[in-house]
Design a protein with these regions (language model features):
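Juxtamembrane helix-entry segments on the extracytoplasmic side of multipass membrane proteins
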Residues: 5-10, 32-37, 41, 58-63, ...
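Juxtamembrane helix-loop-helix junctions in multi-pass membrane proteins
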Residues: 18-46, 88, 92, 163-188, ...
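Specific transmembrane alpha-helical segments of multi-pass solute transporters/efflux pumps
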Residues: 18-19, 23-27, 52-97, 105-107, ...
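Hydrophobic/aromatic residues within transmembrane alpha-helices
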Residues: 30, 39, 43, 83, ...
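Specific alpha-helical transmembrane segments that line the substrate/conduction pathway
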Residues: 38-48, 81-121, 157, 243-262
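Helix-helix packing/entry segments at the starts of transmembrane helices
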Residues: 40-42, 93-99, 167-188, 223-263
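Hydrophobic transmembrane alpha-helices of multi-pass small-molecule transport proteins
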Residues: 45, 51, 68, 107, ...
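Transmembrane alpha-helical segments that form core, pore/gating elements
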Residues: 48-51, 104-105, 110, 142-203, ...
Length: 297
């Protein structure tokens, strides 16, 4: 792995984070035609098929794949989609779910007993101030594009994402794309059952039979573009460059998410939202810097 990135690799990394950021808008389009948990089930159906036929199952226990699939499918995406139907805008969802970074750090410290470094504590304080601002406006401002319920649900999704990170870390060096495809199998049936019980069989059947071509494009894109291409290319880049060179690019995901939501969905950008975004991104950036400083020692 080399820290030098050719322009083509840099552009590829930018394309991946652009896809991940703008995908929050695509999710919103899909949710206009599918109930939330059904849409999540379709995402994981297209993430698993036909890739499990092409990609060999990673050499990890089945129960590890099942844990990752349930946490990622029901916990992360099921909850994010549920909140995004009515309770949080795509731009804010892309920002709030990044709390997974800090949940992962805290979990790692609990598991390993490692103490937080001063820069990490500062990063956590900055991000907490940003998320506190979002929580305050979600509770007090009816025009804030987020309810307190929506904020809480996406925070829970971020926690589930962090739990998935811990499972994947335990899996060790595996093909990330194969791991994602095979673990997706375990998300499909639970999400479909939740959809049938909470959204009703009638709405499920109606959505499947009446969705437009664009609705299906949004569903397929979740699996093919966002998951298979996104994770596949990200894994390819991580195999060729150090993580400290590649992972900072992910900071642009909420930036693209917020900008795409503003341009394509006319999501308002009041001052408090810009300040909250800067605080969270400041915290995330400081955390990346802390990781780099630690890596150089």
């Amino acid at each position: 792995a080399t820290s030098f990135m050719p322009l083509s690799h840099l552009l590829l990394a930018l394309l991946v984070v652009f896809i991940w950021g703008t995908n929050f808008v695509v999710i919103k389009w899909g949710l206009a035609e599918f109930p939330a948990f059904l849409f999540a089930a379709l995402r994981f159906l297209f993430s698993a098929l036909p890739w499990i036929v092409i990609l060999r199952r990673p050499a990890v226990p089945w129960n590890m794949l099942a844990r990752a699939g349930l946490l990622l499918g029901v916990g992360q995406f099921g909850l994010v989609y549920w909140a995004m139907r009515e309770d949080i805008s795509p731009g804010l969802a892309s920002l709030v779910v990044q709390a997974q970074v800090f949940f992962t750090i805290i979990m790692s410290m609990v598991v390993t007993g490692e103490r937080a470094r001063p820069l990490q504590i500062m990063a956590l304080i900055l991000a907490t101030c940003g998320y506190g601002l979002v929580a305050w406006y979600s509770a007090t401002d009816p025009t804030s594009a987020v309810t307190l319920f929506g904020f809480g649900v996406v925070m829970a999704a971020a926690f589930c994402w962090a739990c998935t990170n811990m499972v994947m870390r335990k899996a060790g060096r595996v093909n990330m794309l194969a791991f994602t495809a095979w673990s997706s199998l375990f998300a499909i049936v639970p999400l479909l059952l939740i959809s049938l019980f909470t959204e009703g069989a009638d709405s499920v059947v109606y959505a499947l039979t009446h969705a437009s071509g664009w609705g299906w494009v949004a569903a397929v894109w979740q699996g093919v573009g966002n998951t298979v291409f996104g994770f596949g290319m990200w894994g390819w880049l991580l195999a060729r460059h150090p993580a400290v060179t590649i992972t900072p690019m992910a900071l642009l995901v909420p930036v693209f998410g917020i900008l795409a939501s503003a341009v394509l969905l006319q999501e308002a950008l009041p001052a408090w939202k810009i300040i909250a975004t800067c605080l969270v991104l400041g915290g995330l950036s400081l955390n990346v810097y802390a990781s780099r400083a630690r890596g150089k020692r």
